[in-house]
Amino acid sequence: MTFEMLYSKIHRATITDANLNYVGSITIDENLAKLAKLREGMKVEIVNINNGERFSTYVILGKKRGEICVNGAAARKVAIGDVVIILAYASMNEDEMNVHKPCIVLVNEKNEILEK
């Protein structure tokens, strides 16, 4: 049996852009994504602290420092300046669950790393 467990998260990231006309996804600063162990195409859940919206999408690696841009239809669920939590999960068996420690990255309002 496997269980869906928290794999990693970026906590309290600030939305820097929302692009309704781009094909879906969330663009995340490549350095920040790598630090959080997120890979291009990986499914993530976004929790908007400002309005309570929760939605799933996939990661695109961005080039701009601090970039967090929600694309496509999901852009309607955020506003520039909103604070979000970006979560990734992984399927694990009980042995994996017992040793796994999620990667948690805390950022400031400019999406600069405070703590990992």
Curated annotation (Swiss-Prot):
<feature type="binding site">
    <location>
        <position position="57"/>
    </location>
    <ligand>
        <name>substrate</name>
    </ligand>
</feature>
<feature type="modified residue" description="Pyruvic acid (Ser)">
    <location>
        <position position="25"/>
    </location>
</feature>
<dbReference type="GO" id="GO:0005829">
    <property type="term" value="C:cytosol"/>
</dbReference>
<feature type="binding site">
    <location>
        <begin position="72"/>
        <end position="74"/>
    </location>
    <ligand>
        <name>substrate</name>
    </ligand>
</feature>
<protein>
    <recommendedName>
        <fullName>Aspartate 1-decarboxylase</fullName>
        <ecNumber>4.1.1.11</ecNumber>
    </recommendedName>
</protein>
<keyword id="KW-0566">Pantothenate biosynthesis</keyword>
<dbReference type="GO" id="GO:0015940">
    <property type="term" value="P:pantothenate biosynthetic process"/>
</dbReference>
<keyword id="KW-0670">Pyruvate</keyword>
<comment type="subunit">
    <text>Heterooctamer of four alpha and four beta subunits.</text>
</comment>
<dbReference type="GO" id="GO:0006523">
    <property type="term" value="P:alanine biosynthetic process"/>
</dbReference>
<feature type="active site" description="Schiff-base intermediate with substrate; via pyruvic acid">
    <location>
        <position position="25"/>
    </location>
</feature>
<comment type="function">
    <text>Catalyzes the pyruvoyl-dependent decarboxylation of aspartate to produce beta-alanine.</text>
</comment>
<keyword id="KW-0963">Cytoplasm</keyword>
<feature type="active site" description="Proton donor">
    <location>
        <position position="58"/>
    </location>
</feature>
<keyword id="KW-0456">Lyase</keyword>
<keyword id="KW-0704">Schiff base</keyword>
<keyword id="KW-0068">Autocatalytic cleavage</keyword>
<dbReference type="Pfam" id="PF02261">
    <property type="entry name" value="Asp_decarbox"/>
</dbReference>
<comment type="pathway">
    <text>Cofactor biosynthesis; (R)-pantothenate biosynthesis; beta-alanine from L-aspartate: step 1/1.</text>
</comment>
<dbReference type="InterPro" id="IPR009010">
    <property type="entry name" value="Asp_de-COase-like_dom_sf"/>
</dbReference>
<comment type="similarity">
    <text>Belongs to the PanD family.</text>
</comment>
<keyword id="KW-0865">Zymogen</keyword>
<keyword id="KW-0210">Decarboxylase</keyword>
<dbReference type="GO" id="GO:0004068">
    <property type="term" value="F:aspartate 1-decarboxylase activity"/>
</dbReference>
<dbReference type="InterPro" id="IPR003190">
    <property type="entry name" value="Asp_decarbox"/>
</dbReference>
